[in-house]
Amino acid sequence: ELLQKHKRDSWIVFTENKKQAKEFNKIINKKGYKSAIYNTDLDNAEREENLNNFKSGNLNVLVSCTALDEGFDMPEADGAMILSASSSKRQRIQRMGRVLRITANKENALIVTVYSSNTEYVKLKEESNRYQLENVPIRWQKMK
């Protein structure tokens, strides 16, 4: 529902674990999204193929648990959905950084964090101050 509500060209979806990634991928494929999983259960060739298909636009959703957290430059992505609120500030920053890079074809990015408690919301909002100091405009919207 969130993918439909917030129209974006390409999404990276971060999940809690591989099982959740597989289930989420199955659900969104049934809804007509072109998506694939990126994790360490796949062999190198399949991971590379999924990544290249995402970067070229053949896939519009790439689902991963931690394999894309660090070391990947994904300027093609203009949306991120974080389905697992990590207690690691570093991990959250890395995940958000996957889509915050501005390119010639992208003026902004959308990050949706699904959280379960008000405590998580307050913590995430406080962390956003770091990005505002770096001149990254942030707009918070609480969805029900």
Predicted regions and their residues:
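Conserved interdomain linker/interface between the two RecA-like ATPase lobes of SF2 helicase motors
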Residues: E1-I12
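Short, hinge-like loop/turn segments at secondary-structure boundaries
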Residues: N53-S56, A80-M81, V99-L100, N129-R130
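A short beta-strand element within the Helicase C-terminal
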Residues: V61-C65, D69-S86, Q91-R92, N108-V114
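Cofactor-binding loop segments of dinucleotide-utilizing enzymes, especially the Rossmann-like FAD-
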Residues: E16, T40, A85, V114-S116
